[in-house]
Swiss-Prot record:
UniProt binding sites for a beta-D-galactoside 1: N48, H61, R65, N75, W82, G83, P84, E85, E86, R87, K88
Gene coding for it: LGALS9
Keyword Repeat applies: yes
Gene source species: Homo sapiens (Human)
GO biological process, one term: positive regulation of dendritic cell chemotaxis
Name by which UniProt lists this protein: Galectin-9
Length: 355
């Protein structure tokens, strides 16, 4: 079964988690699990690619264990019986630290990348097309699980061009509470063609239906600032925009603007010098009234990474930071399709944009 696009991600799902892989595993599918290893007494976590929800048939069991110096077990379970373990004694995960774990399905094997470095290759013991479920359990907190089909991209993913155990050309992973969602890893730092994926999300672990116009992902290693791009089709209810990056250690301010012609329909402006997140609209070069109230403390921290989700609804924009709902901003410019430009500037390193 061919993919026409990519499955929407699961956002901040509770652990233990089991979710459907729409259409099952396909050659070329990339699945990314992004989260943080808990600092608790737990010593293991696992990511399973399995048939159904029983756990009796697991095509690929990826199981980091913080025991005996740390190691990772890979295995397959058929009809409730485990096969011989394959162990890798290097432990790429750290307790209390975020991680970015990507699985690439290929005809002969799974290739696994951890924090931008190709970590292990696991040859199929059972036909991978039987797999229709992903499950995660153990001592982790999840930020998201995302899906991407590189067949929609006219370039090869870096897994197929980078020698085994060699790092991909991505900037060093910044330490912080959340990490950037990955795109297709380029084999060199040059920009590559954008790819189409679906990413709209409602409640944690749940997904909206596919939007009328699929979102665009711009998988650059890093972005020049300020950054400006077109929002294909403009805004509409269920449209989702995702940005990730790292706040500079000496940051004063940065902004994310959604623009309509010469107007700024939505101005999101974290200000570290004021310990505030300011929201506003500018029409004909005149600013409206600021909105500053927040349900909790300032979510952005100097020197730490962040993710911002902006979800357009009929009457407002809903904004979440690091997977947690932060505020709603009611539309002041109501002709949503004309809001078709994204501008980002200020004291951040921008690492991922999806519109």
């Amino acid at each position: 079964m061919a993919f026409s696009g990519s499955q929407a991600p699961y956002l901040s799902p509770a652990v233990p988690f089991s979710g459907t892989i729409q259409g099952g595993l396909q050659d070329g599918l990339q699945i990314t699990v992004n989260g943080t290893v808990l600092s608790s007494s737990g010593t293991r976590f696992a990511v399973n690619f399995q048939t159904g929800f029983s756990g009796n048939d697991i095509a690929f069991h990826f199981n980091p264990r913080f025991e005996d110096g740390g190691y990772v077990v890979c295995n397959t379970r058929q009809n409730g019986s485990w096969g011989p373990e394959e162990r890798k004694t290097h432990m790429p995960f750290q307790k209390g630290m975020p991680f970015d774990l990507c699985f690439l399905v290929q005809s002969s094997d799974f290739k696994v990348m951890v924090n931008g470095i190709l970590f292990v290759q696991y040859f199929h013991r059972v036909p991978f097309h039987r797999v229709d479920t992903i499950s995660v359990n153990g001592s982790v907190q999840l930020s998201y699980i995302s899906f991407q089909n590189p067949r929609t991209v006219p370039v090869q993913p870096a897994f197929s061009t980078v020698p085994f155990s060699q790092p991909v050309c991505f900037p060093p992973r910044p330490r912080g509470r959340r990490q950037k969602p990955p795109g297709v890893w380029p084999a060199n730092p040059a920009p590559i063609t954008q790819t189409v994926i679906h990413t709209v999300q409602s409640a944690p672990g749940q997904m909206f239906s596919t939007p009328a116009i699929p979102p665009m992902m711009y998988p650059h290693p890093a972005y020049p600032m300020p950054f400006i791009t077109t929002i294909l089709g403009g805004l509409y209810p269920s449209k989702s925009i995702l940005l990730s990056g790292t706040v500079l250690p000496s940051a004063q301010r940065f902004h994310i603007n959604l623009c309509s012609g010469n107007h700024i329909a939505f101005h999101l402006n974290p200000r570290f010098d004021e310990n505030a997140v300011v929201r506003n609209t500018q029409i004909d070069n005149s600013w409206g009234s600021e909105e500053r109230s927040l349900p909790r403390k300032m979510p952005f921290v100097r020197g730490q990474s962040f993710s911002v989700w902006i979800l357009c609804e009929a009457h407002c924009l809903k904004v979440a930071v690091d997977g947690q709902h932060l505020f709603e901003y009611y539309h002041r410019l109501r002709n949503l399709p004309t809001i078709n430009r994204l501008e980002v500037g200020g004291d951040i390193q921008l690492t991922h944009v999806q519109t």
